[in-house]
A protein has these predicted regions:
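Transmembrane alpha-helices and immediately adjacent membrane-cytoplasm interface residues
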Residues: 49-59
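Short low-complexity, flexible loop/linker segments enriched in glycine and/or proline
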Residues: 76, 137-139, 196-200
């Protein structure tokens, strides 16, 4: 319980105190958007590192060499824990935004930093708004910013190594932007908090990055989803 309280306090303090550097970054972004992006990324990676240290979480990464360094990609990963983003973001090269549920946009200071690192907010209950998010993601990818999506649409509370069915249109961004998909398998992230909430316990998380998949070689949407899902499960 103490670890959970510490993690929450640190996160809240960062969001509050971070208003000052956030304003400075806003000013920097007026003249140099790329510099703003790079600094924002480093700051978020730093605070995530602090949260992992306080929570006693160890992260093992495999397959980092599979991530293309010369272009944006769509990361497609399984989702079991709030710590999935905290652990994975620190490993990613280049600017990467996550697709988050629309409710996250209701938290003012959190929303600010998420937008600074190019996160998108998805309303799955509104087809029109969902399409806007997909198109925004396509623009991000075409502009060289990678996107991470959890195609299950929610945290999977099933057995370790399982995956929920992909939500419809989960791979549309990569399809329309003609960018590769990098499947990602995250193992044992729920051991940090979800498996024994409200206690945070020491855990070892493994994140495996698979080889990029060219969606153009797969003719139908279902085949594309099946291929990526199979790769994710195989890596778990």
């Amino acid at each position: 319980m103490i670890r959970l309280i510490l993690v929450l306090l640190i996160a809240i303090l960062y969001l509050v105190i971070g208003c000052i550097p956030a304003f400075i970054l806003w000013l920097i972004g007026k003249k140099n958007p790329d510099l703003k992006d790079r600094i924002s990324r480093r700051m978020i990676q730093w605070i995530f590192g602090v949260l992992l240290f306080v929570s006693g979480t160890k992260v093992k990464a495999e397959g980092l060499e599979n991530i293309p360094k010369d272009r944006a990609v769509l990361y497609v990963g399984n989702h079991r824990s709030y710590f999935d983003i905290i652990t994975s973001y620190r490993l990613l090269p280049g600017i990467t935004g996550y697709v988050a549920k629309k409710e996250m946009a209701k938290v003012p200071l959190l929303r600010l930093w998420m937008r600074y690192i190019h996160c998108l907010f998805l309303d799955r209950s509104n087809v029109k708004e969902g399409l806007k998010t997909i198109l925004a993601g396509v623009d991000e990818l075409k502009n060289g910013h990678s996107i991470w999506i959890f195609p299950e649409g929610t945290r999977n509370r099933g057995e370790e190594g399982s995956m929920l069915e992909f939500k419809e249109g989960s791979l549309k961004m990569a399809d329309k932007a003609a960018c590769p998909v990098v499947p990602v398998a995250i193992a044992h992230s729920a051991d940090v908090l979800e498996n024994h909430f409200p206690f945070i316990r020491r855990a070892a998380i493994t994140i495996r990055f698979g080889e990029p998949i060219d969606l153009k070689s797969l003719p139908r949407e279902q085949k594309k989803q099946d291929k990526v899902a199979a790769n994710n499960i195989e890596m778990m």
